[in-house]
């Protein structure tokens, strides 16, 4: 049984596909960047094993640009044990161009929107020193709800997503 079906999260620009063996995600990131996404996973084999052994708790997805079917980002959704329909969202893109960043933002918005519309509470967290992740999620409308010595925890709802700077920049200006 899968955690959530996102097979229909796509538009004419991007498409999310379930992570599968052979996607070779880990090597697309620098070691430093990868450990910001999944600090305890050091190889593709460990990542595959994690998804295979816990399909009801964690799922991975790869974001593709529709035009040329090129992978541009990876995320995983982790079911939080304390709540039935609460998930934690983590990931990143490996493209460094402004266009690839906009595509990743667009894909992230569509995926988070789908999760929220399916009735999931969506949260995330990042290490305090991961300023890029914190600013990105804040730009999407995430709000801090807890801080520890090491991490910042955030949540989002549909209203905050639709009112966010990034959502308005991409969808109201019809970029891409």
Residue locations for each model-derived region?
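Conserved acetyl-CoA-binding loop-helix of GNAT-fold acetyltransferases
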Residues: 99-115, 135, 139
